[in-house]
């Protein structure tokens, strides 16, 4: 598998993780959802260390992707408090 394929696989795994977490939202609170996303991202950060640094996403990029996922969840829930909670949870 070449580097471009590895990066594509990494991004697909991230999207699958975010998507599966979103579909559990009916049963989970936003904080639980965000924690699940963080576990997925942390796992992928560890996993991607086998890739060339030139093709890695750094932690900031992954957190930006997590933020986008939370915004997406917010849009699907139409709940202003959800996004405020998500931003507060994600912020260092």
From Swiss-Prot:
Main location: host cell
Alphabetical list of InterPro entries matching this protein: Rotavirus_NSP6
Keyword Oxidoreductase assigned: no
GO cellular component: host cell mitochondrion
Transmembrane segment boundaries: none
Compartments, record wording: Host cytoplasm; Host mitochondrion
Alphabetically ordered keywords of this record: Host cytoplasm, Host mitochondrion
Domain of life per record: Viruses
The family this protein is said to belong to: Belongs to the rotavirus A NSP6 family.
Oligomeric and partner information: Interacts with NSP2 and NSP5.
Protein name: Non-structural protein 6
Lineage summary: Viruses, Riboviria, Orthornavirae, Duplornaviricota, Resentoviricetes
């Amino acid at each position: 598998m070449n580097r471009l394929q590895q990066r594509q696989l990494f991004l697909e795994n991230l999207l699958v993780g975010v998507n599966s977490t979103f579909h559990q939202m009916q049963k989970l609170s936003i904080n639980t959802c965000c924690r699940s996303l963080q576990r997925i991202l942390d796992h992928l950060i560890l996993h991607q260390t086998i890739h060339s640094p030139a093709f890695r996403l750094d932690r900031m990029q992954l957190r930006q992707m997590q933020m986008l996922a939370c915004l997406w969840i917010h849009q699907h829930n139409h709940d202003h408090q959800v996004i405020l909670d998500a931003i507060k949870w994600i912020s260092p």
